[in-house]
Curated annotation (Swiss-Prot):
<comment type="function">
    <text>N-methyltransferase that mediates the formation of anserine (beta-alanyl-N(Pi)-methyl-L-histidine) from carnosine. Anserine, a methylated derivative of carnosine (beta-alanyl-L-histidine), is an abundant constituent of vertebrate skeletal muscles.</text>
</comment>
<comment type="subunit">
    <text>Monomer.</text>
</comment>
<keyword id="KW-0808">Transferase</keyword>
<comment type="similarity">
    <text>Belongs to the class I-like SAM-binding methyltransferase superfamily. HNMT family.</text>
</comment>
<feature type="binding site">
    <location>
        <position position="313"/>
    </location>
    <ligand>
        <name>substrate</name>
    </ligand>
</feature>
<protein>
    <recommendedName>
        <fullName>Carnosine N-methyltransferase 2</fullName>
        <ecNumber>2.1.1.22</ecNumber>
    </recommendedName>
</protein>
<dbReference type="GO" id="GO:0030735">
    <property type="term" value="F:carnosine N-methyltransferase activity"/>
</dbReference>
<dbReference type="InterPro" id="IPR016673">
    <property type="entry name" value="HHMT-like"/>
</dbReference>
<keyword id="KW-0949">S-adenosyl-L-methionine</keyword>
<dbReference type="GO" id="GO:0032259">
    <property type="term" value="P:methylation"/>
</dbReference>
<dbReference type="Pfam" id="PF13489">
    <property type="entry name" value="Methyltransf_23"/>
</dbReference>
<keyword id="KW-0489">Methyltransferase</keyword>
<dbReference type="GO" id="GO:0035498">
    <property type="term" value="P:carnosine metabolic process"/>
</dbReference>
<feature type="binding site">
    <location>
        <position position="119"/>
    </location>
    <ligand>
        <name>S-adenosyl-L-methionine</name>
    </ligand>
</feature>
<dbReference type="InterPro" id="IPR029063">
    <property type="entry name" value="SAM-dependent_MTases_sf"/>
</dbReference>
<dbReference type="GO" id="GO:0008170">
    <property type="term" value="F:N-methyltransferase activity"/>
</dbReference>
<feature type="binding site">
    <location>
        <position position="90"/>
    </location>
    <ligand>
        <name>S-adenosyl-L-methionine</name>
    </ligand>
</feature>
Length: 322
């Protein structure tokens, strides 16, 4: 049964990500989920996500990080060993993985690289394998895919008592969909070799997402795409675990101008991705549509450039020490 609009029960990010609290929706008290609104399926999410990538600088933002910071991280890996072990958690179709491998090869010429991948989506695994088949300069690099979720991988490791260690583990934009964030971070951190590094890429607290989620998540359908979290939630977990870390902030933008053009298909996909809702513009109450579109134009969410509305998609790159 839907909670009364006066007081909504929300799952909010906290140190343990477990406590449900009653949260006052403040001035949005008349806005709430109606039966016609539903969350995106996995396939619909992929389609909406592609629209996001097509109109955002997310990958360019990661490329800047790869250029400015990653060479220094990679140079410190391996501790003189002849083989460097990498684990990608939720690697998707592998584009970012291969870019990082190239940086590692440049930092450690001739070193063998054992790259393992945890990715539950079979389409993504197939696309990753195809990318590897087409890629040049992968001599000395081995690939092992685990078609599992991160929690399934953890369970398998514990059941078989095969706790393999890695020199570099990365979790790029995937912790939103993890059931138990603190224990997931704790487990994969325990998989690091001495002097290893854990890279977590997550939305920054300076992003428009942080402002949008604080005000409107109670108005949207619950989704198994997971937690509404930003970098502050992750660094709080790391501090509680006593893990040393450094945060690198990189600006990223997303052109959402089409969100405000009635009937625009790309704008519809963008609103679906923003809200995690299938056909948000066609199913949400008019008051919610209006309020959300108005919020997207506010300075805490977006800026204007050459007549376009650019949503703030800033990323935090968190590098944790072993």
């Amino acid at each position: 049964m839907e909670p009364t609009p006066e007081m909504k029960r929300n799952r909010l990010p906290s140190m343990n990500f477990e406590a449900e609290i009653l949260a006052d929706p403040h001035d949005n008290s008349e806005l709430y989920v109606i039966p016609s609104m539903r969350s995106l399926t996995a396939e619909e999410y992929v389609e909406a996500f592609q629209s996001f990538l097509d109109h955002s600088t997310e990958h360019q933002c990661m490329d800047e990080f790869n250029k400015e910071v990653m060479p220094h991280i990679m140079a410190g890996l391996g501790n003189g060993k002849s083989t460097i072990n990498i684990l990608g958690v939720g690697s998707g179709t592998g584009e970012q993985d291969l870019k990082m491998i190239q940086i590692l090869q440049a930092a450690h010429p001739g070193v063998l690289i054992n790259n393992e991948i945890i990715e539950p989506n079979p389409q993504h695994v197939a696309a990753y394998k195809e990318l590897v088949n087409r890629a040049p300069d992968l001599q000395g690099v081995s690939f092992t895919w685990h078609q599992l979720t991160s929690s399934e991988y953890e369970q398998q490791v514990k059941e078989k008592n095969t706790h393999k260690k890695f020199d570099f583990i990365h979790m790029i934009q995937m912790l939103y969909r993890v059931e138990d964030i603190p224990n997931t971070i704790k487990f994969f951190h325990s998989c690091l070799n001495h002097q290893g590094k854990l890279l977590i890429i997550i939305l920054s607290d300076s992003s428009g997402w942080a402002s949008l989620w604080k005000k409107y998540r109670h108005c949207l359908p619950s989704t198994d795409s997971g937690h509404y979290i930003t970098s502050d939630s992750i660094t709080a977990v790391l501090r509680k675990l006593g893990i040393k870390y450094h945060v690198y902030e990189f600006p990223s933008g997303w052109d959402i101008t089409e969100c405000f053009i009635e009937g625009d298909p790309a704008g519809g996909h963008m609103m679906d991705f923003l809200t995690g809702t299938k056909n948000f513009l066609g199913t949400a109450p008019a008051a919610l549509r209006s309020r959300l579109q108005e919020a997207l134009c506010q300075p805490e969410c977006s800026s204007r450039k050459d007549g376009r509305v650019i949503f703030c998609n800033n990323l935090s790159m968190i590098v944790a020490e072993s």
